[in-house]
Design a protein with these regions (language model features):
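Active-site cavity-forming subdomains of large catalytic enzyme subunits
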Residues: 1-50
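Glycine/charged-rich beta-loop-alpha catalytic/anionic-binding loops adjacent to active sites
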Residues: 19-25, 65, 183-185
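Anaerobic metallocofactor- and corrinoid-dependent redox/one-carbon enzyme cores
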Residues: 31, 58, 63, 69-191
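Short amphipathic alpha-helices and their capping/turn segments at secondary-structure boundaries
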Residues: 46-52, 82-85
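Glycine-rich phosphate/diphosphate-binding loops that line cofactor/substrate pockets in enzymes
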Residues: 50-60
Length: 191
């Protein structure tokens, strides 16, 4: 996968070696030590910048799975959703990722589509992922991991409802492809 990432960077043109650091964990003896060293380099690079205030409307935050259990849908995920709604109310944007996490609760997001075009994009997004699973002989509705189940998640719907709570109550503004820049402020779903 790292080769693909490096190739993507090369296709996009040059990059700043001080700003972008990476390691291939299989190629290093002690990934914690190397990781710390890479972080030190990033911190040193960042120290050269001056902080300044910018409006919240320029902030984009990704909402990713943090490990679901029986309490995350009651505690952390609603809090993240409230943050998302607050940021969006200030003109900022959030991106809800991990489409398979949405399976089982996708209609909640469909019902919040900003318009018919966005609704169609959400339907296409969900169906494309389900078709991908089917083409590769994967079970669509068996997403909870053993760890999720041990933590109290009993069904895909339990897990999916937790996922959708991270998006708050804002309308879904758009669906974007991986690597695409947000065109519409607000809640975006990532392909």
């Amino acid at each position: 996968q790292m080769d693909s990432f490096i190739e993507l960077l090369r296709e996009r043109g040059s990059w700043n070696d001080e700003r972008i650091q990476w390691m291939i964990t299989q190629d290093v003896e002690d990934e914690l030590a190397i990781g710390r060293e890479l972080l030190k380099r990033c911190i040193s690079y960042a120290a050269g910048f001056r902080r300044r205030e910018i409006p919240s409307s320029r902030l984009v935050v990704g909402l990713k799975c943090g490990g679901s259990d029986g309490l995350s849908g009651l505690t952390a995920n609603p809090l993240v959703g409230a943050f998302s709604d607050d940021l969006i109310a200030q003109g900022g944007s959030t991106i809800l990722t991990e489409v398979p996490e949405m399976f089982g609760a996708e209609t909640i997001l469909m019902n919040r589509a900003a318009d018919r075009t966005v609704y169609g994009k959400i339907v296409s997004l969900i169906n494309s992922f389900k078709e991908y699973f089917i083409r590769h002989n994967q079970t669509v509705y068996e997403n909870p991991s053993p760890g999720n189940k041990k933590g109290g998640i009993s069904t895909l719907e339990d897990k999916s409802l937790g996922c959708t709570q991270k998006s708050g109550d804002a309308p879904v503004a758009d669906v974007i492809r991986y690597g695409q820049v947000i065109r519409t402020p607000g809640l975006n779903l990532l392909q």
